[in-house]
């Protein structure tokens, strides 16, 4: 209600100002009409032949000039008044008051839920991606391991049944067999490389395709560092030890003129033992030998022959 009263007063004030602006503009336009009439009278008199004397015409021209200046000044002042009135109507700030908040009756609150339509929740989208991923993982399952595990679980059931004839024994055996099948299933679903060489422990497909799909578990390398005196100034002269070694590469060391040589055990084919030899930075007459991995010389002659045949097949392909 307070806002409506203030709005009416504001509108009435604006109406009075607009009426004054209209009056000032009308009087200014009237002054311009008078000025135009005086200008046209001057041109009309100049076109007609003069019958009076020159002095009378000079006085009439002076009177006309003064009247014309007066009319022009009056028109300018009236239009200035119009401009000032327009500027005055644009200044100022509107004031508003907040009306009291209307209290909503509880009857309307009770009737509102009846009018709103009931919206049923949308059904969840079908999980097609999970089914596809499960089917893709099922393709790589090794069923031989599952069959062996299920037979072992059946044997465990029989043993538990004979040992404990109570009612809780079958339930315990079932839970144990279920846990073993789940663990074996999770192990079998892991991604393995079928082309892994069991003798060497290396992936055979990596040499042909350049990519290996074996599990990327980081192996903890066991290192053993010793210092031995150098035999000569040549890096190829390495002090001998209990095993025979074959050099397969070298790498330069930053800040040292002597490179680091890399060797692998050649006593038995496929031995994972490695070592690298480098000059000591504090004493050039000493060598630092770092051993990595353990020696594995327990392979039989048949295993060595099989590994050699596998390597020949890979090299020929």
Curated annotation (Swiss-Prot):
Signal peptide: none annotated. Induction: By salicylic acid. GO terms for molecular function: calmodulin binding; DNA-binding transcription factor activity; transcription cis-regulatory region binding. Residues 145-186 are annotated as: Disordered. SMART domains: WRKY. Transmembrane segments: none annotated. Residues 234-300 bind DNA. Its main location: nucleus. Residues 173-186 have a biased composition (Low complexity). One of its GO terms (cellular component) is nucleus. Keywords: DNA-binding, Nucleus, Transcription, Transcription regulation. InterPro entries: WRKY_dom, WRKY_dom_sf, WRKY_plant, Zn-cluster-dom. It holds the Pfam family WRKY. It is found in: Nucleus. Transcription factor. Interacts specifically with the W box (5'-(T)TGAC[CT]-3'), a frequently occurring elicitor-responsive cis-acting element. Belongs to the WRKY group II-d family. This is Probable WRKY transcription factor 15. It comes from Arabidopsis thaliana. The gene is WRKY15.
């Amino acid at each position: 209600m307070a806002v409506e009263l203030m709005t009416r007063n504001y509108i009435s004030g604006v109406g009075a100002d607009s009426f004054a602006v209209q009056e000032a503009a009308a009087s200014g336009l009237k002054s311009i009409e008078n000025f135009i009439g005086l200008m046209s009278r001057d041109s009309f008199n100049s076109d007609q032949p003069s019958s009076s004397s020159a002095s009378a015409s000079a006085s009439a021209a002076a009177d006309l000039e003064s009247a014309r200046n007066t009319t022009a000044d009056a028109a300018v002042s009236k239009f200035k008044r119009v401009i000032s009135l327009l500027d005055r109507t644009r200044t100022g700030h509107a004031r508003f008051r907040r009306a009291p908040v209307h209290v909503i009756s509880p009857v309307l609150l009770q009737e509102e839920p009846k009018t709103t339509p009931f919206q049923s929740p949308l059904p969840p989208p079908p999980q097609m991606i999970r089914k596809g991923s499960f089917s893709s993982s099922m393709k790589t399952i090794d069923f031989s391991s599952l069959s062996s595990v299920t037979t072992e679980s059946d044997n465990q059931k029989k043993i538990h049944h004979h040992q404990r004839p109570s009612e809780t024994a079958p339930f315990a055996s079932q839970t144990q067999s279920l846990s073993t099948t789940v663990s074996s299933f999770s192990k079998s679903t892991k991604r393995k490389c079928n082309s892994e060489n069991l003798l060497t422990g290396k992936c055979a497909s990596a040499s042909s395709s350049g990519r290996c799909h074996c599990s990327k578990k980081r192996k903890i390398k066991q290192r053993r560092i010793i210092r031995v005196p150098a035999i000569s100034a040549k890096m190829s002269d390495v002090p001998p030890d209990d095993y025979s070694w074959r050099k397969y590469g070298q790498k330069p060391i930053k800040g040292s003129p002597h490179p680091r040589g890399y060797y692998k055990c050649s006593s038995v084919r496929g031995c994972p033992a490695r070592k690298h030899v480098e000059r000591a930075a504090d004493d050039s007459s000493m060598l630092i030998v770092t051993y990595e991995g353990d020696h594995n010389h327990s392979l039989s002659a048949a295993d060595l022959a099989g590994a050699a045949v596998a390597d020949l097949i890979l090299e020929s392909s």
